[in-house]
A protein has these predicted regions:
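Exposed low-complexity, polar/acidic, P/S/T/G-rich flexible segments that act as propeptides
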Residues: 88-125
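Exposed beta-sheet edge and beta->alpha loop/turn motif
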Residues: 231-296
């Protein structure tokens, strides 16, 4: 079990809110995404936020949701970083012929009412980003692009957060680590009521941009509570992390800093994942991706 979207938590006041556009239509469930084919390991950033990381050296054909990293309509940027395998590095890096498989496109669709996916006949391929022709191997490569979107809603989210880049780095890191330790203790105790107090508003915003109804949200919350209680006392040690700042200084988090081959009996490289990891009593693990911000 892995959480799909990142939970946003304040370091101080624990509240979030959203505001709808006056012209929002009840039947609009517009999703923007990057439709990608990526050969090898990669990290995907949208609006200066790491939204997806995959450490498997294989061919990835996937959709990267844009809605999760933006708060309203506008023009934004993305970047996708491709990394060499150890074998490729011995040959100088990513080989030029590998780039023939790399594809990145902007898509838009109307989400189905229940679950994930596009309503039939609504999937639009808006733009295909150019891929370079390289003449020699490179240790890594980064493709960047811009896109403009028009969403039927507007969220407050982290928009009023402080620019944490202006903080003393050591002071900020101590504060962030202390807060993660607090979250770790809550999860390890199986204190689902306290956890819900912290994440309720963020879960509501996730449900909102994902066009999920209250029934779906309540079902998700119920299942998460059951998982936390079932694996009470099974939190992995809070270790091997580094602090990362995103969203032009508005968001901060801890991420695992080293590669792994296995986690609690399953093949899983957790570099870049949240260090809040709960082991399953019957094997496997769940991460709790959290980003923090401080209101101005």
């Amino acid at each position: 079990m892995r959480n799909k979207y990142c939970i946003l938590i304040l370091l101080t006041v624990l509240s979030l809110s959203w505001k709808q556009k006056n012209n929002m239509k009840s039947n609009e469930r517009i999703v923007y995404a990057l439709d990608v084919t990526i050969p090898g390991r990669y990290e995907a950033y949208i609006n200066d936020i790491l939204v997806e990381t995959n450490n498997e050296m294989s061919m990835h054909n996937t959709i990267i949701n844009i809605n999760q990293a933006v708060l309203k309509s506008g023009t934004y940027q993305f970047r996708i970083k491709l990394f060499s395998s150890n074998e490729e590095l011995r040959k100088g890096g990513i080989q030029p012929d590998t780039f023939q498989f790399l594809k990145v496109g902007l898509v838009k669709y109307q989400k189905i009412a229940v679950g994930e996916g596009a309503e039939e006949g609504t999937y639009q391929y808006l733009y295909s980003y150019p891929i370079p022709n390289l003449e020699k191997p490179v240790p890594y490569y980064e493709i960047k692009g811009k896109f403009t979107i028009d969403l039927p809603y507007e969220l407050n989210g982290w928009s009023n957060g402080q620019d944490l880049r202006k903080w003393d780095k050591d002071t900020l890191k101590k504060k962030v680590i202390a807060y993660y330790k607090k979250l770790w203790e809550i999860l390890n105790k199986g204190d689902v009521d306290q956890w819900q107090k912290l994440v309720k508003k963020s879960q509501e915003e996730i449900a909102f941009f994902n066009y999920s109804d209250k029934e779906y949200l309540n079902k998700y919350i119920k299942e998460e509570k059951e998982e936390i209680i079932k694996d009470k006392g099974m939190m992995a040690a809070l270790e091997d992390y580094e602090m990362k700042i995103y969203a032009d200084g508005r968001l901060v988090c801890l991420e695992r800093s080293n590669h792994t081959k296995q986690v609690n009996g399953i093949d899983w490289d957790i570099k870049g994942e949240s260090p809040l990891i709960q082991y399953g009593k019957e094997g496997g693990a769940a991460t709790f991706p959290v980003k923090l911000y401080l209101p101005q």
